[in-house]
Design a protein with these regions (language model features):
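Outer-membrane beta-barrel pore domains
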Residues: 56-59, 78, 103-107, 115-118, ...
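A short secondary-structure junction signal
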Residues: 170-171, 179-183, 204, 215-217
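N-terminal periplasmic/intermembrane-space "pro-region" immediately following the signal or transit peptide
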Residues: 1-4, 8, 12, 17-49, ...
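Short strand->helix junction
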Residues: 7, 90-92, 320
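Outer membrane beta-barrel
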Residues: 33-175, 185-190, 194-202, 265-268, ...
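Glycine- and other small-residue-rich loops at beta-strand/loop junctions that grip anionic moieties
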Residues: 148, 182, 255
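Short, well-ordered amphipathic alpha-helices
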Residues: 30, 193, 333-335
Length: 338
């Protein structure tokens, strides 16, 4: 017997809430007994993003929405073992509940850590960091279209660490994305290495090799590859970041589709609470088609209330050479982080 979708969502949300309330009460009891560090230790965290969006594309009405609502728990089981569980009550684009992250880390030393579970795939900057850290309201549309993983995450194992001016993360994952069962035997290999050139300036190289299913009946196994170069300068008051990505999907034994794109973002901290940003992005969904090109210029501002909680405004000037009906987008967002 199939339960209604609303019943499933209610049970899902209720179960998460009960577990998190129990863990929160456990933390409070532990902190009351002693100020010393004890294991296991837990902390509750989460955020809500409420938006007002007006998309000038025909058939897209303006309106308010809860874009994301996430609640999670993280902590340490021992000095070397930590964990993170993060659930989304509402996740784009369908506004349905999803498991965001669920993984455990084992720290051997600063050079080598092992992670197992569902986590952000180590590729580039934007896809490899939490969305609340992005200077813009949303990750660039270019990177979202060049991304191959649902929610930029997948299930597998990862090794990561740092040494002096060098850091790395290498993972072996299913290749199907978050909350999706594996369908084929080959696994995807993905990773990034970063080099800190000076204080606040880092460059990175990323690579991804894997397989996917395609064809009318989704039963044809093909190869796909991605590579990226990123630069990130965390200056004050000026900060900049950018990524260039190329992706190649094997369609048939003799045909490949090559996609290229990237973005450049610059921001300026006017005060401790107020900053402005501008981002340029471009995408060629098929490098063999001359007029197949998308360009977007985003102008925005952030006002920080406390910590990562902020009010943001973005306006996207969008130019799609193929789809002329793809018009500009205005978005205002209240982000509350706790």
């Amino acid at each position: 017997m199939n339960l209604p979708k609303n019943t499933f969502k209610l049970n899902y949300i209720t179960s998460i809430t009960i577990v998190l309330l129990f863990l929160t009460s456990t933390v409070y009891a532990q902190s009351s007994d002693s100020e010393q560090v004890s294991y296991p230790s837990y902390s509750l965290f989460g955020f809500v993003q409420q938006q007002f969006a007006e998309d000038l594309t025909p058939g897209s009405p303006a309106g308010f929405s809860i874009h994301r609502a996430r609640l999670g728990v993280q902590g340490k089981i021992s000095e070397n073992i930590s964990f993170r569980f993060f659930g989304g009550f509402i996740e784009p684009p369908q506004s349905n509940p999803q498991l965001v992250h669920a993984y455990m880390d084992y720290k051997i030393n600063s050079y080598l850590n092992i992670r197992a579970g569902q986590f952000l795939a180590p590729f580039g900057i934007e896809g490899n960091e939490g969305i609340i850290l992005n200077p813009a309201i949303e990750r660039s549309l270019t990177l979202r279209r060049l991304n191959t993983f649902r929610m930029f995450s997948d299930i597998g194992v990862q090794a990561f660490g740092s040494l002096s001016h060098f850091n790395y993360a290498i993972a072996l994952v299913n290749g199907t994305g978050a909350n999706r069962a594996e369908q084929i035997d080959p696994k995807d290999f993905i990773g990034r290495v970063g080099f800190n050139l000076t204080d606040g300036l880092e460059i990175g190289l990323s690579g991804h090799a894997g397989h996917y299913l395609t064809g009318q009946e989704m039963n044809e196994e093909r190869a796909r590859y991605r590579a990226a170069l990123d630069v990130n300068y965390k200056g004050d008051p000026l900060f900049v970041r950018g990524e260039l990505v190329t992706r190649k999907d094997n369609i048939t034994n003799s045909q490949d589709v090559v996609m290229n794109g990237g973005y450049f973002l610059a921001g300026y901290k006017v005060t401790d609470r107020f900053e402005t940003i501008v981002r340029y992005e471009h995408l060629k969904p098929n490098s063999d088609v001359d007029n197949d090109r998308l360009e977007i210029i985003t102008m925005g501002a952030n006002y920080y209330l406390m910590g990562r909680s902020r009010i943001s405004v973005n306006y996207d000037f969008r130019d799609d050479k193929v789809n002329e009906d793809f018009e500009n987008l205005f978005t205002a967002q209240l982000q509350f982080v706790f």
